[in-house]
């Protein structure tokens, strides 16, 4: 006889997940207020909360402060954000960051290693696994304390199978990241594109949880984007969606690291900007930079450009050569033009921008000015900087695991 219908355990898990999500969005609440929101009886919610308290998933936070009233005071419950911990790994072209956080995203451990592209991906990932285990050991954390490992990489990702299909600027071929790391660490791994992971973090921890349709744009070191439709990340054909950095702006233009020609990234990424600056670099064209770098164009690197952008108000950027200023302004205009075209088609509720280039207030303001020039509706009210941008190195990886946990979806054991 074939059993049909929904199991009682499934219903209970679904209700527990609803409770966790409400607490994540609203903070500590009373059992009665939770019951009113999810449509269950206070008695049913009390039973569910008792189960979760026994499992250390939630905890009581004391009595609610309210006006004097007869009867028992409401007792608040909240998520136990220190119930377990999460390892977040962000693999970029130059460096890879390793961060251990609690479920809320508060940091316990931070470390950084060089992203080695001079060796086979498997060897680098094995080295990475050793570093992760070292960081856990130094913090006296056991694998049983870890909910999972969230991995973020640029480029095209097959999340379901844990495969990096093409990590632009890092690996040209497919890399089975989840399989390799789970074998080394014996801990569940979730892999996602870095911009999509950040979008997931915004929906969990940031202003994204208040909007239904959102576009995310990242600038620095490359260009990336993600789309949220009806509170869900949009996944396109072949795991490839919303690649604004590979919007073609110049037919027969420069070859991009994605393999095509004329992509936006070939003109506005930090690598492209460095190449363009090197082309015009001379004592006559760039006298200030020439002096800063002692006549050595090899010192013009992505790291140098990043330091200019991040140290706004200090150093070279305050007295930049006019020729280099024109290159940066041209890049900002291109970014704004493509962004307006994309937003005109998608018409989102809001747009959230982040990345090292948008960290610079002058660059962000000029970007908004160009957007408004092309369409007066695209002001800083519609296009805003992420409040999570200072957590960009780890919050995406944390969100991958935390959102799965809050949904009470079982993370497959390796």
Question: Residue locations for each model-derived region?
Answer:
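ATP-binding/phosphotransfer module of carbohydrate and carboxylate kinases, centering on a glycine-rich
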Residues: 1-61, 67-71, 76-137, 141-144, ...
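Phosphate-binding/catalytic loop of phosphoryl-transfer enzymes
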Residues: 89, 147-152, 156-275, 402-408, ...
